């Protein structure tokens, strides 16, 4: 099968896993939420990754999420899945992703182990070469590969991009100027809008947007202003929306996931403020703070009506 070997660019959607109060995955809610992201113009769907509580999913739930995402996307945008953890499971889920019609996968770090560079290279290479799907390498935590190792991985045609979740700008600049446009470069830092002004000038033209799950027009407004040099609007969005939400996110471990769900619930989307342990729900005070920020954002930065 001939595939387009190119990483998605722009604002990337990372849907959450909507659980009901009994902790069961709600497929219809997931479908609706992905449709919402697509209608808002997000350029790709990354399903069952960090925001989708990858680490908590059973194989059946993972399969359900991939099926829903592929169905909802309908070929309009590429669908990437999360694969990683222990190598055997990563390979199984990579095969499953290919079988279910995904376009690629994001390679998450191995479980617990801190390997040497050669081991991390072999881990990534084994997963990359296990299918014909496109692969994006996630630089994070215990799996941060050097320029030399990533350059070796570019020999695999399936590798199309690198997502940075570390924030080592010295390494990022070295990567971009050594490897160039052979790969797509994705900003995957928590609340990526905060750091995107530093990433865009060095060649990172994509980012994973948490807030796009509930205020996608703000994320779009921000990115357009950033690209077009509208510094005043960027500052206003920072001051009134992005930094205040980020301040709440930093209050508790796990809020990178659960704060998204709280935001979606506040905005009337079909998601509850529930997450699986060890991630906890957003606490009442923080929930109310987020509610106030979103109300102010809606008043100050209203969504433009769609033109017919």
From Swiss-Prot:
EC code: 4.2.1.41
Record's keyword terms, sorted: Lyase
Reactions accelerated catalytically: 5-dehydro-4-deoxy-D-glucarate + H(+) = 2,5-dioxopentanoate + CO2 + H2O
Database matches in SMART domains: DHDPS
InterPro entries referenced in this protein's UniProt entry, alphabetically: Aldolase_TIM, DapA-like, Dehydro-deoxyglucarate_dehyd
GO BP terms in the entry: D-glucarate catabolic process
GO molecular function (one): 5-dehydro-4-deoxyglucarate dehydratase activity
The protein's enzyme class: lyase
Listed pathway(s): Carbohydrate acid metabolism; D-glucarate degradation; 2,5-dioxopentanoate from D-glucarate: step 2/2
HAMAP family assigned to the protein according to its UniProt record, in alphabetical order: KDGDH
UniProt record similarity statement: Belongs to the DapA family.
PANTHER family for the chain: 5-DEHYDRO-4-DEOXYGLUCARATE DEHYDRATASE 2-RELATED, DIHYDRODIPICOLINATE SYNTHASE
Protein name listed in UniProt: Probable 5-dehydro-4-deoxyglucarate dehydratase
Organism name: Bacillus subtilis (strain 168)
